[in-house]
Amino acid sequence: MLDNQLLRENPQYVATQLLKRGFQFDAVTFSQLEEKRKALQVSTQSLQNERNLRSKAIGEAKSRGENIEPMREEVNKLGAKLEQQKTELDEVLKQIEVISLSLPNIPHESVPVGKDELDNQEIRKWGDVPAFSFPVKSHDELGEALGQMDFALAAKITGSRFVVMKGHLARLHRALIQFMLDIHIQQHGYQEIYVPYIVNADSLLGTGQLPKFEADLFKLTGDNGYYLTSTSEIPVTNTVREMILSAEQLPIRYVCHSPCFRSEAGSYGKDTKGMIRQHQFEKVELVWITKPEDSYNALEQLTQHAEVILQRLNLPYRVVALCTGDIGAGSAKTYDLEVWLPSQNTYREISSCSNMEAFQARRMKARFRNPDTNEIQLVHTLNGSGLAVGRTLVAIMENYQDEHGNIHIPDALKPYLGGIDIISVK
């Protein structure tokens, strides 16, 4: 959510900034609603004051034994008019809130202006793209040939965009989770946190998934209004909702492993084969809560921490700055890490690292006390994948395959697999 004061005082500036995203904000209509709100608030307060004065006068007249019925009728008329004004004011406030909740974040000035992913800017590359002397296979071809990855069985159990993994591939998948957690906790200093995988609507509103992106979520039946979490960013970030933190508590740096559940409502026809885009997947998430002045340095650190995982696994990747037309609605600035997939002969997203600035904090009422001014200020929130586990498995399978369809284990993972150094075709 954007700053209400900014929206009220300079809606045209907001419209200009959001246009960089391709988002049309009707500043004129918003300003008209704001003028109506102010007029109704002044009118309502005036009627309230007048009714209070008349009510007091009734009490004084009654003590003098005067006839108060005409005065009481006037007060009743004022009361009815006041209730009508309050109803109108509530309706205008609801309209303003609907607009406010629909607005995306203002992009940071350093974000490249562009229309879509074609306008994203490559920042750096790491690692050498492997040169194979044989026709490479995709991860799903490799997994099925190994007899350890079964999409047909998953489709029978549930439906499309699911997978069943067995044997060493299932073990490798689990090892990746532990490896990522160990690096982030032991070397990067994150605190591990375990959170619910089911969240309520208030949490989703706080991090920005509701009301705009409900179609991307799996909603549970029943009267609780619960949803399966699409990313642990949601429950982890909401741990500071409606809190006033001390400056000494900041920055807060959490790492969390969780399954994620997404409907992929807007992804019909995309990545229909394999594990690239699934309804259920595992992710290790990094979340920062910082002071406003520290958040952009934090974004660079968070991104580098995610990069370390790829470097330890010796997987070629690149870092891309998303343009204004491609960043997520709540983000002010985002870096994507894209790993090399030989079967597609291209880089694919494996992590998205974002600074949300105060966008989520304003929705969540997540604040801290500034020791220099003693003022209560909004924190900044950041999040990023460190990494998406399934896509990391995919990248290992494809980059570490040999001509026989065997998968060689990266050195960094061998201690997690009891010394296994190859997953062989039988």
Curated annotation (Swiss-Prot):
GO terms for molecular function: ATP binding; serine-tRNA ligase activity. Pathway: Aminoacyl-tRNA biosynthesis; selenocysteinyl-tRNA(Sec) biosynthesis; L-seryl-tRNA(Sec) from L-serine and tRNA(Sec): step 1/1. Keywords: Aminoacyl-tRNA synthetase, ATP-binding, Cytoplasm, Ligase, Nucleotide-binding, Protein biosynthesis. L-serine binds at T231, S232, E233, E285, S385. It is found in: Cytoplasm. Its EC number is 6.1.1.11. One of its GO terms (cellular component) is cytoplasm. Its main location: cytoplasm. ATP binds at R262, S263, E264, E349, I350, S351, S352. One of its GO terms (biological process) is selenocysteine biosynthetic process. It comes from the Bacteria. SUPFAM superfamilies: Class II aaRS and biotin synthetases, tRNA-binding arm. It holds the Pfam family tRNA-synt_2b. It catalyses: tRNA(Ser) + L-serine + ATP = L-seryl-tRNA(Ser) + AMP + diphosphate + H(+); tRNA(Sec) + L-serine + ATP = L-seryl-tRNA(Sec) + AMP + diphosphate + H(+). Catalyzes the attachment of serine to tRNA(Ser). Is also able to aminoacylate tRNA(Sec) with serine, to form the misacylated tRNA L-seryl-tRNA(Sec), which will be further converted into selenocysteinyl-tRNA(Sec). NCBIfam families: serS. Belongs to the class-II aminoacyl-tRNA synthetase family. Type-1 seryl-tRNA synthetase subfamily. Homodimer. The tRNA molecule binds across the dimer. Consists of two distinct domains, a catalytic core and a N-terminal extension that is involved in tRNA binding. This is Serine--tRNA ligase. It comes from Legionella pneumophila (strain Corby).
